[in-house]
């Protein structure tokens, strides 16, 4: 079977759980302390979810779905204009937004095979996707789980 980057990252992030949700309190606290919110994204979140400012900030600072797309990435530029409830219920929406994230961040050249065999590529991908070099080890474990070489 041919495994995809979606398979690898969803295994790392949520074990494939489309409805996974993680609030990132440290990220939220930093934003609150600095007042460092992208108001256009907040407006997009409020419009799509018909919610309060406080709820929009929670959505902004949470990661959503099988591959844990951060709310601020999900609603960047208004490209996704449905509620997070719709996002969590629909794998096609999640795959599409994952692809959009990869494209926006220059990560489309990475394949499971490359991540399995090239440590430098794995570390680079990990730093962009999750920010932590230790994330590269989790990617390798997922590749090994699926037998990707």
Swiss-Prot record:
GO cellular component, one term: virion membrane
Enzyme class, broadest EC rank: hydrolase
InterPro entries: Muramidase (IPR024408), Phage_PRD1_P15_lysozyme (IPR016284)
Entry keyword Hydrolase: yes
Alphabetized UniProt keyword annotations: Antimicrobial, Bacteriolytic enzyme, Cytolysis, Glycosidase, Host cell lysis by virus, Hydrolase, Membrane, Viral release from host cell, Virion
Known catalytic reactions: Hydrolysis of (1->4)-beta-linkages between N-acetylmuramic acid and N-acetyl-D-glucosamine residues in a peptidoglycan and between N-acetyl-D-glucosamine residues in chitodextrins
Biological source species: Enterobacteria phage PRD1
Function: Endolysin involved in host peptidoglycan digestion after permeabilization of the cytoplasmic membrane by holin. Involved in host cell lysis and liberation of progeny phages. Displays strong lytic activity against chloroform-treated Gram-negative cells.
The protein, known as: Endolysin
Lineage start: Viruses, Varidnaviria, Bamfordvirae, Preplasmiviricota, Tectiliviricetes
Thermal properties of activity per the entry: Inactivation temperature above 4 degrees Celsius.
Membrane is among the record's keywords: yes
Topology in the lipid bilayer: Peripheral membrane protein
pH-activity dependence text: Optimum pH is 7.0-8.0.
Superkingdom of the organism of origin: Viruses
Protein family: Belongs to the glycosyl hydrolase 24 family.
EC number: 3.2.1.17
Any one GO molecular function term: peptidoglycan beta-N-acetylmuramidase activity
Localization in the cell: Virion membrane
Any one GO BP annotation for this protein: defense response to bacterium
């Amino acid at each position: 079977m041919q495994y995809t980057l979606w398979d690898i990252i969803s295994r790392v992030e949520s074990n494939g759980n489309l409805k996974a949700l993680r609030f990132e309190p440290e990220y939220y606290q930093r934003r609150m302390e600095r007042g460092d919110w992208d108001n256009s994204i907040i407006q997009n979140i409020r419009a799509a979810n018909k919610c309060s400012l406080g709820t929009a900030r929670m959505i902004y600072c949470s990661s959503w779905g099988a591959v844990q797309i951060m709310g601020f990435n999900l609603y960047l530029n208004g490209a996704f204009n449905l509620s997070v409830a719709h996002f969590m219920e629909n794998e096609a929406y999640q795959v599409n937004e994952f692809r959009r994230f990869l494209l926006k961040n220059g990560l489309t050249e990475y394949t499971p095979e490359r991540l399995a065999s090239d440590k430098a590529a794995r570390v680079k991908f990990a730093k962009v996707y999750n920010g932590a070099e230790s994330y590269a080890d989790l990617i390798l474990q997922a590749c090994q789980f699926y037998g990707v070489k």
